[in-house]
Design a protein with these regions (language model features):
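Acidic, polar-rich low-complexity tracts and alpha-helical solenoid repeat scaffolds
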Residues: 1-10, 18-152
């Protein structure tokens, strides 16, 4: 009886380990597709969330979906998706991307008061997005007719 129970436990544990490898590899695959902006990436990201609904990468995948929506000009959808992302669950490299694309989607919807704090926070960081954040923060001030801050 103990031997049978031991075998069953071993099988279950090996299955769990294999499943963990599957969701990690699937994430790496969709992440590479996203980085290359391959056709069909959006569908693959959405399918990943369906296949692995409790993955630790769900916020990263949601971020990618929001970025793609922003790049396609679907700003309202992008904002909706990006607002659901828990920033604390993102990798350190992904956080500046979240700030930038969230702010940019707001600007495109003329929601400057929502966009401005995101760009101001991003200005404090040294990332690829920092020069853009400086410009868009000034633009937000300008659109709100705060010309003194816009020129700073």
């Amino acid at each position: 009886m103990k031997k049978t129970l031991f075998i069953i436990v071993c099988i279950i544990l090996s299955s769990v380990a294999a499943l963990a490898q599957d969701y990690r590899q699937a994430f790496v695959d969709v992440q590479q597709e996203f980085e290359q902006r391959l056709p069909g990436t959006l569908g693959h990201l959405q399918q990943y969330l369906k296949d692995y609904p409790y993955t630790t990468y769900s916020d990263e995948v949601q971020l990618m979906i929001g970025v793609l929506a922003t790049e396609k000009g679907n700003y309202k959808q992008a904002s909706k998706v990006l607002e659901q992302v828990a920033r604390k669950n993102l990798s350190r490299q992904a956080v500046p991307m979240w700030y930038f694309y969230s702010g940019y989607a707001y600007i495109q919807q003329q929601e400057y008061k929502k966009a401005l704090p995101l760009f101001l926070e991003l200005k404090k960081q040294q990332t690829l997005y920092t020069p853009h954040a400086k410009y868009y923060a000034g633009y937000c001030y300008y659109c709100q007719q705060d010309f003194a801050h816009a020129m700073a």
